Amino acid sequence: MKNINPSQTAAWQALQTHFDAMKDVKISELFAQDSDRFAHFSATFDDQMLVDYSKNRITAETMGKLHALARETDLPAAIHAMFAGEKINRTEDRAVLHVALRNRSNTPILVDGKDVMPEVNAVLAKMKDFSERVIGGEWKGYTGKTITDVVNIGIGGSDLGPFMVTEALKPYKNHLNMHFVSNVDGTHIAETLKPLNPETTLFLVASKTFTTQETMTNAHSARDWFLKTAQDEKHVAKHFAALSTNAKAVGEFGIDTNNMFEFWDWVGGRYSLWSAIGLSIILSLGFDNFEKLLSGAHAMDKHFASTPAEKNLPVLLALIGIWYNNFFGAETEAILPYDQYMHRFAAYFQQGNMESNGKSTDRNGNPVDYQTGPIIWGEPGTNGQHAFYQLIHQGTKLVPCDFIAPATSHNPLSDHHSKLLSNFFAQTEALAFGKSREVVEAEFTAAGKSAKEVEHVAPFKVFEGNRPTNSILLRDITPYSLGALIALYEHKIFTQGAILNIFTFDQWGVELGKQLANRILPELESDSTIDSHDSSTNGLINRFKAWRN
């Protein structure tokens, strides 16, 4: 990967000049000028997904200049470097190969000259065997009962991805009840365990190093809870499995290392649901559905690696995001899935994007002089419409939005889905085109309102419009289409990081707080007054000590 400051490129300067001409252009004008705008600014993927980006403040010239930026920062070489197993995570000296985990073509992918696919396939086969024994009832707990509940204990990438996928694909779930514990707050593990039976519960401890503080604290509490009933530590092996690479620590915990599922340092946490971290997905949905999830992602991988930039969906969405973030000053992006099963999708990519591209140092080690990762947030529609859409429609912040919906519902009750999708279509139309003062006044007049009433209220009912959106319409939410959708966003994030000259696959920003917490924890053991920090931190710790007693 080349280390090029994007803001110093000719393409960036051309975009700045172009922005000056575009900043006051209305989306409504762009549609008026081009009756085929939808056809010109939309694309389909695999007859499963339609991406409509026509309701953006862009023209063909805009896209041409954005593509020039991608070429000048050598995006094609960056894409090739990732797929070739080069160590593009330079600060940790690691390759970045989540694409290998779903490489259904099984073509060789080399790291340090060694094909990783045999090991990937071996772990998949091991997970298949384990999951079939648990799901089929062959795996028994210590009293001979079959497993009814599975608790995944992990945090960050070891929790967010599996939780999101098992929720999104809940229509495909089997009889096993899935639970996810992440927070070190004891309430999370305590409330999860309350209704469970130790004799029929299986725990998955997801920690690559088997040292993650939150995860291991919860794992030891789960083990203590289990042993209160089981009494004998030898029974731990029947009720705990590990998603880890630390065989020594796993064995010391009491887990049979035959039930330890490994992954590799080229798997980043927030890209790990495709790895052994996805064992909870397999236990919930079955191995066949997990394979379909992998296949959908692999299809998007092939699209990303081989499709020209002008038709490459992750590249298109990435470039449009850079356009708003760096030229319009938009600081956030909203992800708005019109599907209740997808209620964790925005939270998943909040981590995926913000932990990846929330960087202020470029690949040369210099402070950046441009915007990098945006703030990601969102909720399912139509809930969001009754919560925060007011600001998106009429506030002073520009919030580009991704609207996501399936054409077919898993729960076709009455006319629920038609009503849901009518809101999906209406919101993007309203955001783009708004409502003028003239239309508002005409509506008031038609309703018999007086001129005074019109003058008094009309200004507050005007919608400026010109709020940009992408619409992503899926045939339905299946393991395959969800896999493709997740990979679409992953590659969008990668593309933006590559162009913006930052390291997308490290996360040093999470480390300082951990270090300080490890220093503070021993200070909380006694009731003595603390004075080793700043006055604020000292004051908070000392008040905590006074109040906890």
Curated annotation (Swiss-Prot):
* PROSITE patterns hit by this protein: P_GLUCOSE_ISOMERASE_1 (PS00765), P_GLUCOSE_ISOMERASE_2 (PS00174), P_GLUCOSE_ISOMERASE_3 (PS51463)
Which reaction is catalysed here?
A: alpha-D-glucose 6-phosphate = beta-D-fructose 6-phosphate
Q: Supply the alphabetized keyword list.
A: Cytoplasm, Gluconeogenesis, Glycolysis, Isomerase
| Any Pfam family hit | PGI
GO-annotated molecular function:
carbohydrate derivative binding; glucose-6-phosphate isomerase activity; monosaccharide binding
Q: Which residues form the active site?
A: E355 (proton donor), H386, K514
Pull one GO CC term from this UniProt entry.
cytosol
Q: What is its main location?
A: cytoplasm
Task: Give a GO biological-process term.
Answer: glucose 6-phosphate metabolic process
Give the EC number(s) under which this enzyme is classified: 5.3.1.9
Compartments annotated for it: namely: Cytoplasm
What does this gene product do? Catalyzes the reversible isomerization of glucose-6-phosphate to fructose-6-phosphate.
The record's similarity note reads: Belongs to the GPI family.
NCBIfam families tied to this protein? PRK00179.1
Q: What is the name of the protein in this document?
A: Glucose-6-phosphate isomerase
**What is the source species?**
Pectobacterium atrosepticum (strain SCRI 1043 / ATCC BAA-672) (Erwinia carotovora subsp. atroseptica)
Gene for this chain: pgi
